[in-house]
């Protein structure tokens, strides 16, 4: 067996969304901050392509790289690699990272609760793990400040006419549309249609509405389309199913933590949720995040909320990713039969 590289990975998913974690074999990227390190990963693409492209990966996966924290308050930091983006934050990936840190002993577990400060590329988050018998059973993540950007905005979409949408930020940037108004029910057999239409909506939203984070000049686009079903009552708690289309054209299997945070920010801005209120986010496969509006805050002069999300993650495997020096496809490849071609016109 020959290999010029060995990367150690712990496989994990959070409520259905794959968020594997690199625990060894990769040196920290250059950069004075975790955000700068993530910009290097985003522009270089060598690591992302190696772990996400075939034959080692696929468009359905995310991979997280553990790095030493830059902020002394944090016990660990990580960089999120999605198929197309390297975002400031991810809810499902933060739950995967927290679970791997504790279940593998990288960070000592304290039962019944372990409190951690972690450093995402976009800043610090607080994670509380509810632990029993050596397992982190649930993780509650207090997310970055989240805010509504444009409410009830008009979006022209070819073949559909004028849509009424909301744009918001919940650790990443979203265009939120009414799933039922477009004829969807948030069911697994709609996933391909969600992915295809979602990418058209993302392109149109970037062209017509745009987005600029008030304090992060580098984040100046809308990443995702969230198809949101109308609110229902879940034993007295507002609940909303969703399907989030992720670039280049896949559907989040989890309820999407940043998407739930963005939707809560919109619901708060519209007076539907207040501080202390709970919200249940449900995914296209029926998994759930238990969410809450923790506090009101502001960011860059904008009203915002501090949301939290809670869910489960499960370790699926460990792996050593290798590369044979004679392999003609060492960096991997992608084909449009499974990996959609993304281009923002």
Curated annotation (Swiss-Prot):
Substrate binds at residues 91-92, 252, 257-258. Its EC number is 4.2.1.77. It holds the Pfam family Pro_racemase. One of its GO terms (molecular function) is trans-L-3-hydroxyproline dehydratase activity. It catalyses: trans-3-hydroxy-L-proline = 1-pyrroline-2-carboxylate + H2O. The active site is at 90 (proton acceptor). Keywords: Isomerase, Lyase. InterPro entries: Pro_racemase_fam. Catalyzes the dehydration of trans-3-hydroxy-L-proline (t3LHyp) to Delta(1)-pyrroline-2-carboxylate (Pyr2C). May be involved in a degradation pathway that converts t3LHyp to L-proline, which would allow S.novella to grow on t3LHyp as a sole carbon source. Belongs to the proline racemase family. This is Trans-3-hydroxy-L-proline dehydratase. The lineage of its organism: Bacteria, Pseudomonadati, Pseudomonadota, Alphaproteobacteria, Hyphomicrobiales.
